[in-house]
Amino acid sequence: MGTNQILDEIREVNLSYLLLAQQMLREDRVAAMYRLGIDEDIADILIKLTNSQLLKMAGSNMLLCRFRFDDSLIAEILTSHKQDRALTQSHAAILMAGQPAEKIS
């Protein structure tokens, strides 16, 4: 995979992420903020973006989304194949809820 193809893929992921984030925020702001790991300031910015601004942001050569965990325990919980998937997901959600919301510095 060449550099240009990777950059195209990053732009596509960025646009999909931004569109999904806006949709989630419009439908249930509080749940979206929790699921996206963002604070109210970021939510306000995202919800107000025009289509032109979305495309401009998506055109960045860096990913706008990232993994919300740096803890290997959360990664192990999310990838485990235990029988009680709902309990496993709840456990991961509890651990991730303790992670701070992202801030723009």
Curated annotation (Swiss-Prot):
Entry GO MF terms: DNA binding
Domain of life: Bacteria
Subcellular location(s) per record: Cytoplasm
GO cellular component, one term: cytoplasm
Pfam families: FlhD (PF05247)
Keywords carried by this UniProt record: Activator, Bacterial flagellum biogenesis, Cytoplasm, Disulfide bond, DNA-binding, Transcription, Transcription regulation
RNA-binding found in the keyword field: no
GO biological process, any: bacterial-type flagellum assembly
Entry keyword Transcription: yes
Coiled coil: none
Subunit structure comment from the entry: Homodimer; disulfide-linked. Forms a heterohexamer composed of two FlhC and four FlhD subunits. Each FlhC binds a FlhD dimer, forming a heterotrimer, and a hexamer assembles by dimerization of two heterotrimers.
Record text about domains: The C-terminal region contains a putative helix-turn-helix (HTH) motif, suggesting that this region may bind DNA.
Family annotation (NCBIfam families): PRK02909.1-1
Family listed: Belongs to the FlhD family.
Function: Functions in complex with FlhC as a master transcriptional regulator that regulates transcription of several flagellar and non-flagellar operons by binding to their promoter region. Activates expression of class 2 flagellar genes, including fliA, which is a flagellum-specific sigma factor that turns on the class 3 genes. Also regulates genes whose products function in a variety of physiological pathways.
Protein name per UniProt: Flagellar transcriptional regulator FlhD
Source organism: Nitrosomonas eutropha (strain DSM 101675 / C91 / Nm57)
